[in-house]
Amino acid sequence: MNRRYLYPILTILVVVILYYAEKYVNKQTEAYPDTSKVLVESSQEFSENLLPTSTTGAIVTHGFFTLSYSEPHEQAEWVAYELSKSHLSNNEFERPYFVEDREVKTGSADWRNYKNSGYDRGHLCPAGDRRFSYEAYHETFLTSNISPQNREFNSGVWNFLEQKVRYWAKKYDGVYVVTGGVLKEGLPTIGDENVSVPEEFYKIILDASDGNFKVLAFLIPNKATNESFYEFVVPVDDIE
């Protein structure tokens, strides 16, 4: 990922730190597993006027996640959301159809671009993270929240990482997530609208439960693998 795609990710992380510092500062916390790849920062001085930025200017705030839409790639360059302990639920809802996101001014890609493409309609904010209400669950089926994912990747290492994030949300009383595909020029595309197929996906998890901000980042190739997601832990600075 080049620097122009890195900046909005890093900025949204700072914004999250700003937002949750006071909320979590007095709560008890446990550390992430000991690893040199975990970035830990501790600072209480941030501008409360700092806002997320976007390389496209197409930021859309929904009820249960926020995204920055990239029209050239017909998908979000990042999706950001909080996963609190109270969000965790085993509720079962009827699976809705994917629908276009009317809040995206240029129009999000039609789900039919994925039909017979060989790729899954991979959620960025997982439906499994939004089972606490039907409205929240339904919102994850907006096509602005999906990206073409290799089927084995989606059901394998990416799914296992999503499950682990839920575990961390329960253990650390909530986390904040920024995730998306690595978007760049020259990617293969699918469908009539030329939806880009990312070669890699990233997921950045922030825990600010005691004011000592812990960030764990993953960068995983969009292909089948038998390796653990822990093999793809990277410093946040490497996601460029």
Where are the regions a protein language model picked out?
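Domain-level detector for secreted/extracellular nuclease and nuclease-toxin modules, and
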Residues: 2-240
